[in-house]
Curated annotation (Swiss-Prot):
Gene3D superfamilies from the UniProt entry: Aldolase class I (3.20.20.70)
Protein name: Phospho-2-dehydro-3-deoxyheptonate aldolase 2, chloroplastic
EC class (word): transferase
Catalytic activity field: D-erythrose 4-phosphate + phosphoenolpyruvate + H2O = 7-phospho-2-dehydro-3-deoxy-D-arabino-heptonate + phosphate
Function: Involved in maintaining the supply of chorismate for the biosynthesis of the aromatic amino acids and other chorismate-derived metabolites.
Entry annotated with the keyword Amino-acid biosynthesis: yes
Native organism: Solanum lycopersicum (Tomato)
Pathway recorded for this protein: Metabolic intermediate biosynthesis; chorismate biosynthesis; chorismate from D-erythrose 4-phosphate and phosphoenolpyruvate: step 1/7
GO molecular function: 3-deoxy-7-phosphoheptulonate synthase activity
Family (UniProt): Belongs to the class-II DAHP synthase family.
Length: 541
């Protein structure tokens, strides 16, 4: 299991298939990543032996339970999903499709050299870990687990240090404990970490004082300083991003399995600046109750030495955006014969790149990682059904997570139609709320921010809609940090517009700080508790 000591060795990661070792220019390109220069002949490399940490003999979860039916709503006009024309997939077949949001590298030869180097690097994650996560997400789809996915909007090279990684991991541990206690169900902890660098942009260029330069697309592409050198896409940044991702994951593994995440340490996870806050007080009260329960278990003769009490499972995720990099880290698993993108356990396709005939969907349909689909109020129900069919033709539970980002009012109007369309198609998905992206505003000072009240309202709308539709609220997806930043306004320790500039450190979008994140987790835990008690009372009738 991911980042856990109770793992089993089960298979080897083979070297890439012949298709994968073909030159990067073997298919015509429709984007500026590639030129028409010839490349070297195919290389044959010895297979890479890598330990998988989950049981490869387990089949992915496929629900054998009939899905709930609901009468069609008068306003929902979704037709059955049309048949999808299948073409043969290859690791580079995305190049035959239109690829959006890719930077233009001026030095194509250097780009090819860098991608070849990354192609020969070891995988960052293992296929067995991704399969294990898919199984857990399958449980969330059935209402038997809850996904907590969070981390930076975009990781940066400048803020890369052990303390920042530890603090984000620690607040996720705290939030996971709160959610698990309230929901009385497993919490699947997935970080937007160890690879969340690239960001899509509304415009390819940015103009200031008559100077027009390429937009900042994340530290793995270019720099955020507004000068020609910084804004020119640099292939060497891809290698630095790989190294930082590997180092981040290495530290996360140590935290998850080295005793730091042991449940007995629950009272020690409080961050210093939340210690004397309302949320810190609530957390200490919860931690004391957990301590009492652990003491009772010890007195009853139940051992605290079991790995489940000493370690935690933790997975990584990022948006699948920079396709040449993702291709270079794709490996064929020798056990299953399937391809896995070994840059992360979980990848998602964004609002700007989820076109049915686009390059990103083409790439993702061929990899076996669990996938997310970001969905706004602009998503047509029939298009969502077709996209799910393309990405999950076998209808495996845990394969697809729908991450909704709409704003509270749009959520109440639009989400029911999406749920009904997916249900009518018989598709199994995990429904998750992203209450961040639909609530971004500009403060009077010009900085982007997000009101905590709006974030809370969207989370409540998400739960209300699922209560109404009889479906399962499967998780939450947050842009957050363990640092004491002032980027989102509101919360119990009220951050005002005037406070924003004091600790506004984000490289992209505003994040919840640790106190706001913990406060939101208590709100979600209360909704999970009410659902649990309501379900129990229904069973008792």
């Amino acid at each position: 299991m991911a980042l856990s000591t109770n793992t089993t060795t089960n298979s080897l990661l083979s070297n890439k298939s012949l298709l994968q070792n073909q030159p990067l220019l073997s298919s015509p390109s429709k984007n500026a990543f590639f030129s028409n220069k010839s490349t070297k002949t195919v290389r044959f490399v010895q297979p890479i032996a890598a330990v998988h940490s989950s049981d490869s003999n387990k089949n992915p979860i496929v629900s054998d339970k009939p899905t709930k039916s609901s009468p069609p709503a008068a306003t929902a006009t979704t037709a059955p999903a049309p048949a999808v024309t299948k073409t043969e997939w290859a690791v580079d077949s995305w190049k035959s499709k239109k690829a959006l949001q890719l930077p233009e590298y001026p030095d194509q030869e250097e780009l090819r050299s860098v991608l070849k180097t990354i192609d020969e690097f070891p995988p960052i994650v293992f296929a067995g870990e991704a399969r294990s996560l898919e199984e857990r997400l399958g449980e969330a789809a059935m209402g038997r687990a809850f996904l907590l996915q969070g981390g930076d909007c975009a990781e940066s090279f400048k803020e890369f240090n052990a303390n920042n990684i530890r603090d984000t991991f620690r607040i996720l541990l705290q939030m996971g404990a709160v959610l698990m206690f309230g929901g009385q169900m497993p919490v699947i902890k997935v970080g937007r970490m160890a690879g969340q660098f690239a960001k899509p942009r509304s415009d390819s260029f940015e103009e200031k004082d008559g100077v027009k330069l390429p937009s900042y697309r994340g530290d793995n592409v270019n720099g955020d300083a507004f000068d020609v050198k910084s804004r020119t896409p640099d292939p060497q940044r891809l290698i630095r991003a790989y190294c930082q991702s590997a180092a981040t994951l290495n530290l996360l593994r140590a935290f998850a399995t080295g005793g730091y995440a042991a449940m007995q340490r629950i009272n020690q996870w409080n961050l210093d600046f939340t210690e004397h806050s309302e949320q810190g007080d609530r957390y200490r009260e919860l931690a004391s109750r957990v301590d009492e329960a652990l003491g009772f278990m010890t007195a009853a003769g139940l051992t605290m030495d079991h790995p489940i009490m000493k370690t935690t499972e933790f997975w990584t995720s990022h948006e699948c955006l920079l396709l040449p990099y993702e291709q270079s880290l794709t490996r064929r698993d020798s056990t299953s014969g399937l391809h896995y993108d070994c840059s992360a356990h979980f990848l998602w396709v964004g609002e700007r790149t989820r076109q049915l005939d686009g390059a990103h969907v083409e790439f993702l349909r061929g990899i076996a990682n669990p996938l997310g689909i970001k969905v706004s109020d602009k998503m047509d129900p029939s298009a969502l059904v077709k996209l799910i069919e393309i990405l999950n033709p076998q209808n495996k539970a845990g394969r697809i997570t729908i991450i909704t980002r709409m704003g509270a009012e749009n959520m109440r109007v639009k989400l029911p139609h999406l749920i009904r369309a997916v249900r009518r198609a018989g598709q199994i998905v995990t429904w998750v709320s992203d209450p961040m992206h639909g609530n971004t505003i500009k403060a009077p000072c010009g900085l982007k921010t997000r009101p905590f009240d709006s974030i809370r309202a969207e989370v409540r709308a998400f739960f209300d809609v699922h209560d109404q539709e009889g479906s399962h609220p499967g998780g939450v997806h947050l842009e957050m940090t363990g640092q004491n930043v002032t980027e989102c306004i509101g919360g119990s320790r009220t951050v005002t517009f005037d406070d924003l500039s004091s600790r506004y450190h984000t490289h992209c979008d505003p994040r919840l700080n640790a106190s706001q994140s913990l406060e939101l987790s208590f709100i979600i835990a209360e909704r999970l508790r009410k659902r649990r008690l309501g379900s129990q009372s229904t069973l008792g009738q």
